[in-house]
């Protein structure tokens, strides 16, 4: 697979985080980041049996030059809150996996992870603000008399919307 690369320098603010773009970042095709279209694609994937992480990552993969099949296999264990443990929502994990792919310079330069962490925190922060939590079990209402706070399809929609916004900001 051939990846398109762009060299980015400078800084930008995404949410409360300043992201330093001094890395060779994967090219982001913003024409593939229409949130409504991405949400529809992710919903189709989820309806076919993809877990929440897979639905998000496979939907966003083409926009960043990642093979959706690779995204699918890499995120298989992140569903149902990390391997069924109902911890961090899989939809968030799928979005974070895409940010890692975009920002990482690879094994030769492991110093890019700090920038990826900032983007990961921004995604989790926005998701938590929208849903009051990032924990799968709490979102699903497991162990609660109140029922679910947000359905899996709703969580996928939210993660897609947030990730599309962050990716568009990175591409600016």
Residue positions per predicted region:
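A short glycine/serine-rich beta->alpha loop
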Residues: 40-47, 78-86, 143-149
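Phosphate-handling active-site elements
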Residues: 63-74, 101-119
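Acidic-glycine-rich active-site phosphate/pyrophosphate-binding loop
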Residues: 26-32, 59-77, 130-137
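DPxDG-like acidic metal-binding loop motif
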Residues: 94-102
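Polybasic, low-complexity association/targeting segments
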Residues: 24-48
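Short, Lys/Arg-enriched N-terminal segments with co-localized hydrophobic residues
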Residues: 2, 12-24
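C-terminal binding/interaction regions
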Residues: 115-172
């Amino acid at each position: 697979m051939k990846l398109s690369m762009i060299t980015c320098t400078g800084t930008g603010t995404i949410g409360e985080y300043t992201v330093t773009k001094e890395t060779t970042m994967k090219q982001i095709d913003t024409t593939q980041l229409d949130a409504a279209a991405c949400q529809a694609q992710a919903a189709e994937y989820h309806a076919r049996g993809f877990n929440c992480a897979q639905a998000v990552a496979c939907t966003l993969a083409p926009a960043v030059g990642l093979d959706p099949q690779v995204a699918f296999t890499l995120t298989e264990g992140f569903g149902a809150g990390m391997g069924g443990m109902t911890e961090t929502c899989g939809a968030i994990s799928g979005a974070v996996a895409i940010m890692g792919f975009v920002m990482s310079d690879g094994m030769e330069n492991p110093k890019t992870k700090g920038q990826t962490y900032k983007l990961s925190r921004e995604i989790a922060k926005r998701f938590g603000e929208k849903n009051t939590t990032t924990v799968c079990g709490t979102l699903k209402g497991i162990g609660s008399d109140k029922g679910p706070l947000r359905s899996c399809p709703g969580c996928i929609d939210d993660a897609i919307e947030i990730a599309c916004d962050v990716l568009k900001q990175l591409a600016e």
